[in-house]
Regions:
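Conserved Walker B catalytic segment
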Residues: 21-35, 53-56
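Short acidic, S/G/P-rich loop/turn micro-motifs used as interaction or catalytic elements
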Residues: 18-25, 45-50, 72-74
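Conserved P-loop NTPase "ATPase switch" module shared by AAA+ and STAND
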Residues: 1-26, 38-42
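Phosphate-binding and hydrolysis-coupling loops of NTP-dependent motor/remodeling domains
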Residues: 10, 42, 50-127
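Structured helix-beta-strand junction loops
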Residues: 35-36, 62
């Protein structure tokens, strides 16, 4: 989330673990969404799949989603569509493996960590 926030032109509201956030944080997220501001948030796949109102639901309906481990059971429900086409059955739980879901389309992605000793360039591993 931090890397995405740094790449944004405006200052987004960044919330880690929105599903565990207090009411004040959730209220700030809902207000930012109502003003069409950029919000970057993370939440558990299970909670995203089973929440039908509030900030998590609004973001799931309107925004791009990054779903990690797209082959696991609640991922399709969280995304609102089948993620089978972007799931590698040989690497269901490979760290950082995911899907980018936006407006009815999905793309496979691989999230990587930056190398601190190398100006935050990503660590590249063959997959």
């Amino acid at each position: 989330l931090r890397a995405l926030a740094q790449a944004m032109a405006s200052d987004p509201l960044v919330v880690d673990d929105l599903d565990l956030a207090d009411i004040a944080t959730v209220t700030r997220v809902e207000a930012a969404l109502a003003r069409s501001e950029v919000v970057l948030a993370s939440a558990s796949t299970e909670k995203v799949a089973t929440t039908f109102r509030g900030a998590i639901s609004t973001m799931r309906e309107r925004e791009a989603l990054v779903v990690l481990w797209p082959g696991m059971r609640p991922a399709d429900q969280a995304a609102g569509m089948s993620l089978r086409s972007v799931t590698d059955p040989r690497a269901m739980t490979l760290p950082g493996r995911g899907a980018l879901v936006y407006r009815g389309t999905c793309l496979p992605i691989q999230i990587v960590l930056p190398r601190p000793e190398d100006n935050d360039r990503p660590i590249e591993h063959p997959v």
